C-alpha cells in the first residue's frame, strides 16, 4: 500500500486543493440551517418580507458558491485520481515487462490482466471518492454537532450520544467486510481465467462436444462468485438500515427534547427546524460515508493486490553496461556446460546435466518426445529462463553477462505459437529491425517462403493484420513470424517447431533457404519430424530432460536407440531394410 502512495505524491497540489474546496462547500452547507432558522424566527414570525427576501438571496448565493466549490473539487479530484491511475498502470505494465518467464508463469496471465485493468480502475475510483468525500462526511458530522451546541446544549447531547454509536456500527461492518472483498476479487480472477480459457479454446471445446461440461464448470465458478458477492452484499446492506434506525431513534428523541425546550421558552421554532436539518445532514453524510467505506474497502483490497504485483522481484538481472558482445573467441557459437533447469514449483528437473557445443554456421536439430525439454533447452539460449545450474555460453561468454539488447541482437527466436500484432505487415517485420528497408523485408520474406503470401495481398506490405493475425492461416502466420526474426539477420536463429503448420514441400524449401543464409548463422531447429532435421550438422536427442544422443543422423542411427525408435515410428517401411551390422539404411 505504501508503495502506491508514490504515484499520488506527483499530484500533491490536486490532492490538497480538492479536499479544501470540498471543506469550503461544507462550511456553506452548515450555515444553511442557521439562515433558514432566521427566516422562520425573524422573517416569518415578524412578517418581515424584506428580511425573508434578503435571507433567501443569501441562500441562493451560498448555493452558487457551494456549487462552484463542488465543481472545483471534482475537477482536481478527477485529475489526481486519473493521473495516479495512469502512472500506476504504466508502472505495473513496465514491471511486468521486466519480469522473467518464471515470475510470469507463477503469477499467471489472467491475474495480471485483472490487476492491470479492473483493480487499477477500482483504485482510481477509490482515490476520486476519497479526495471528495473522505473529509467532507466526517466534517459535516462534526460540524453539525458543533452547530447544534450553538443552538441548544441539551438537545445537542442527543448528537453526542448518537454519533459514537453510529461510528461503531459503520466501522465494525467495515472491518468484517474488508477480508471478504479480497475473497471476492480472488473468485473474480478464477472466473476471468476460465472465461479466457474457454474463449481461446472454443473450437476445441466444440470439436469434442464439451459445451455442456464447459457451461457446467463455468456455472460452478460463477455460482461461487455469486455466493461470495451475495454474502458480502448482505453484510454491506446492514449499513443503511442500521444507520437509519439509529438516526430515526435519535430524531424522535431530538424532537421530543426540542419540544420541551420550546414549551418552556428556551427555544424558538426555527431553531428546532435547524436542529432537525442538522440531523438530516448527518443522516445523508453517514449514508455517503457508508457507501464510501464500501468503495474504499474494495479499493484497498485492489490496491494491495496491485502492490503485490509490484513487489514481485525479478530474478533475471542484466548488466548495466554492455561489452560482452565484443568478446568473440573461438568457433563455438553456443556451449552448454552441465546445464540443468527446474521450473518454479516443479518437483523434477526439466533438463538434467546437458552439455554440447554448437559451432558457427552449423544447423543443430533437436528432437525428442513430448515433454522431453526441447523448448526449454532453446529458451535458455535467449535467456527466457536462467539455468538452475551449469552455464550457457554464447560466443564464449555467459549469457548472463550480456545486456538484454546485446542478446536480443544476437539471437532471433521464432516460437511454436506464431504471434503477430495488430498493424501492417511492414510494422510487424520491423520488430526485428526498426530501420529495416523494404528490400531487407522482402529478402526475409523470400527466405521464409512468405513472399507469395504478401504479394497476394492487395496492399502487400501495408496489408493490415488483425489482432494476433486472425485474418491469416496458421501456416501464413508461421512464415511471417520466421521472416520477422530473419529481418535483423541474427547470428543465432532458434526455430522452436515453428514450421509445424507448413506442408512438407514448403517446409523443405524453408529449410534449404535457411541453410543457404549468408554469414555464419547458427540455426537451432526444434522439430517433431526427423525429415525436418535429418540434414542437420548435429542432432540432439532428448528424453525426459536428459541428452540421450548427440551426432549426425547416420551416427545416431548407429549409436542411439531412442533416435532409431523415433525414426522407425515415422518411417516404418525402413525398419525391414535397416542393416543392424552397418547401422545404415540399405
Predicted segments with their positions:
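Membrane-integrated ABC transporters
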Residues: 1-29, 36, 44-59, 65, ...
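Helix-loop-helix
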Residues: 47-57, 147-161, 231-304, 309-310
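Transmembrane helices of ABC transporter permease
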Residues: 10, 14-27, 38, 58, ...
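Short intracellular "coupling" helices and adjacent cytoplasmic loop segments at the cytosolic face
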Residues: 46-47, 82, 90-114, 118-120, ...
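ABC transporter TMD-NBD coupling linker
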Residues: 199-203, 216, 279-346, 386-393, ...
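An intracellular "coupling" helix at the cytosolic face of ABC transporter transmembrane type-1 domains
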Residues: 10-13, 98-102, 118-131, 135, ...
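ABC-type nucleotide-binding domain
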Residues: 327-586
Amino acid at each position: 500500500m505504501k508503495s502506491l502512495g508514490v504515484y499520488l505524491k506527483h499530484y500533491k497540489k490536486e490532492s490538497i486543493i480538492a479536499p479544501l474546496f470540498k471543506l469550503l462547500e461544507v462550511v456553506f452547507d452548515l450555515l444553511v440551517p442557521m439562515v433558514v432558522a432566521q427566516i422562520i424566527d425573524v422573517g416569518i414570525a415578524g412578517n418581515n418580507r424584506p428580511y425573508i427576501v434578503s435571507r433567501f438571496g443569501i441562500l441562493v448565493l451560498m448555493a452558487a458558491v457551494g456549487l462552484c466549490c463542488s465543481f472545483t473539487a471534482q475537477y482536481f479530484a478527477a485529475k489526481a485520481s486519473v493521473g495516479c491511475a495512469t502512472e500506476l498502470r504504466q508502472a505495473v505494465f513496465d514491471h511486468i515487462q521486466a519480469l522473467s518467464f518464471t515470475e510470469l508463469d507463477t503469477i499467471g496471465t489472467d491475474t495480471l490482466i485483472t490487476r492491470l485493468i479492473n483493480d487499477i480502475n477500482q483504485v482510481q475510483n477509490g482515490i476520486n471518492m476519497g479526495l471528495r468525500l473522505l473529509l467532507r462526511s466526517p466534517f459535516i458530522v462534526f460540524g453539525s454537532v458543533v452547530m447544534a451546541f450553538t443552538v441548544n446544549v441539551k438537545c445537542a447531547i442527543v448528537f453526542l450520544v448518537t454519533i459514537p454509536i453510529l461510528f461503531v456500527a459503520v466501522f465494525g461492518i467495515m472491518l468484517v467486510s474488508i477480508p471478504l472483498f479480497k475473497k471476492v476479487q480472488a473468485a473474480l480472477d478464477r472466473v476471468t481465467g476460465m472465461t479466457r480459457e474457454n474463449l481461446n479454446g472454443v473450437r476445441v471445446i466444440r470439436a469434442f462436444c464439451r459445451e455442456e461440461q464447459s457451461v457446467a464448470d463455468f456455472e460452478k465458478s460463477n455460482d461461487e462468485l455469486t455466493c461470495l458477492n451475495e454474502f458480502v452484499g448482505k453484510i454491506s446492506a446492514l449499513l443503511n438500515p442500521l444507520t437509519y434506525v439509529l438516526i430515526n431513534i435519535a430524531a424522535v428523541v431530538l424532537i421530543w427534547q426540542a419540544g420541551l425546550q420550546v414549551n418552556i421558552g428556551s427555544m424558538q421554532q426555527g431553531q428546532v427546524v435547524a436542529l432537525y436539518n442538522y440531523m438530516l445532514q448527518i443522516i445523508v453524510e453517514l449514508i455517503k460515508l457508508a457507501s464510501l467505506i464500501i468503495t474504499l474497502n474494495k479499493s484497498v483490497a485492489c490496491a494491495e493486490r496491485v502492490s503485490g504485483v509490484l513487489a514481485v522481484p525479478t530474478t533475471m538481472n542484466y548488466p548495466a553496461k554492455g561489452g560482452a558482445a565484443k568478446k568473440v573467441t573461438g568457433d563455438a557459437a553456443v556451449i552448454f556446460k552441465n546445464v540443468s533447469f527446474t521450473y518454479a514449483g516443479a518437483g523434477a528437473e526439466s533438463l538434467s546435466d546437458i552439455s554440447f557445443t554448437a559451432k558457427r554456421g552449423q544447423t543443430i536439430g533437436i528432437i525428442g518426445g513430448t515433454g522431453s525439454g526441447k523448448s526449454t533447452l532453446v529458451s535458455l539460449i535467449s535467456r527466457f529462463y536462467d539455468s538452475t545450474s551449469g552455464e550457457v555460453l554464447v560466443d564464449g561468454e555467459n549469457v548472463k553477462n550480456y545486456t538484454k539488447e546485446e542478446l536480443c541482437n544476437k539471437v532471433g527466436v521464432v516460437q511454436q505459437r506464431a504471434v503477430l500484432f495488430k498493424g501492417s505487415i511492414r510494422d510487424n517485420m520491423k520488430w526485428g529491425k526498426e530501420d529495416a528497408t523494404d528490400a531487407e523485408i522482402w529478402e526475409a520474406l523470400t527466405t521464409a517462403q512468405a513472399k507469395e503470401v504478401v504479394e497476394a495481398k492487395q496492399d502487400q506490405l501495408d496489408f493490415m493484420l488483425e489482432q494476433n493475425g486472425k485474418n491469416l492461416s496458421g501456416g501464413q502466420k508461421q512464415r511471417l513470424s520466421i521472416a520477422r526474426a530473419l529481418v535483423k539477420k541474427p547470428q543465432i536463429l532458434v526455430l522452436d517447431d515453428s514450421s509445424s503448420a507448413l506442408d512438407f514441400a514448403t517446409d523443405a524449401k524453408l529449410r534449404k533457404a535457411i541453410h543457404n543464409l549468408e554469414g555464419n548463422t547458427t540455426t537451432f531447429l526444434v522439430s517433431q519430424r526427423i525429415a525436418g532435421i535429418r540434414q542437420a550438422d548435429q542432432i540432439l536427442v532428448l528424453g525426459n530432460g536428459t541428452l540421450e544422443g548427440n551426432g549426425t543422423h547416420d551416427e545416431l542411427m548407429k549409436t542411439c536407440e531412442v533416435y532409431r525408435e523415433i525414426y522407425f515410428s515415422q518411417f516404418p517401411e525402413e525398419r525391414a531394410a535397416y542393416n543392424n551390422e552397418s547401422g545404415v539404411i540399405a
